[in-house]
From Swiss-Prot:
HAMAP family for the chain: RcsA
Keywords, in A-Z order: DNA-binding, Sensory transduction, Transcription, Transcription regulation
An example Gene Ontology biological process: regulation of DNA-templated transcription
Species the sequence originates in: Salmonella typhi
Name used for this protein in its record: Transcriptional regulatory protein RcsA
Keyword Transcription: yes
CDD domains named among the record's database cross-references: LuxR_C_like
Length: 207
């Protein structure tokens, strides 16, 4: 099973390589790369099953973010796991934001990786039908409200602008926190910004 690791932290590279080898992946099938251009070439050459990327490798350059977005779209059978570069926050969850794109904390546990990658590791094949997770999506109201929330508007302001009760705003905020698996506003904002960077944003149901 071909895999690619794009992370400038040698500790993370070592940890991921060790995990993959312990699960039966051969060392020669693990490719370390450093730049987005190298990633594009490696994905074309190896058709990897899984790619691990630290967002720090692309998030600071809009053209790199755009290229990552294109690479993810061009390789629908590859699972891309993007690690959030967020410090001093306890968050060890992961979210499927597209069929082939997971956003994850770097604190993800080996047994969580086993759950995600088990079938891929066994079958040595693409991801079709193997990730048994719901894709993150918000209702249209939740999506609009989240944007206002991120602009710094409070519950009362959102309530006035959307012409709904403050209690309803609080209820929607609770739903958003549940779906993104955290009560931490910093993590929620980070997930939204990262998703915006490498996709067209979190799915919003049009009803």
């Amino acid at each position: 099973m071909s895999t690619i690791i794009m992370d400038l932290c040698s500790y993370t590279r070592l940890g991921l390589s060790g995990y993959l080898v312990s699960r039966g992946v051969k060392k020669r099938e693990i490719n370390d790369i450093e730049t987005v251009d190298e990633l594009a070439i490696a994905c074309g050459a190896h058709q990897p099953s899984v790619v691990f990327i630290n967002e720090d490798c692309f998030i600071h350059t809009p053209s790199d973010s755009q290229q990552i977005k294109q690479i993810i779209n061009q390789h629908p059978d590859t699972l891309f796991i993007v690690f959030m570069a967020i410090a001093n926050v306890h968050f060890d969850e992961y979210l499927l934001v597209r069929k082939n794109l997971l956003i994850s904390s770097k604190s993800i546990k080996p047994d969580s990786l086993d759950t995600l990658l088990g079938d891929i590791l066994k079958k040595e094949s693409g991801i079709s039908g193997t990730i048994n997770l719901p894709t993150l999506s918000l209702s249209r109201t939740e999506s609009s409200m989240l944007r206002m929330w991120m602009e710094g508007q409070g519950t009362i302001q959102i309530s006035d602008r959307m012409n709904i009760k403050a209690k309803t705003v609080s209820s929607h905020k609770g739903n958003i926190k549940r779906k993104i698996k955290t009560h931490n506003k910093q993590v929620i904002y980070h997930v939204v910004r990262l998703t915006d960077n490498v996709t067209n944003g979190i799915f919003a149901n049009m009803r």
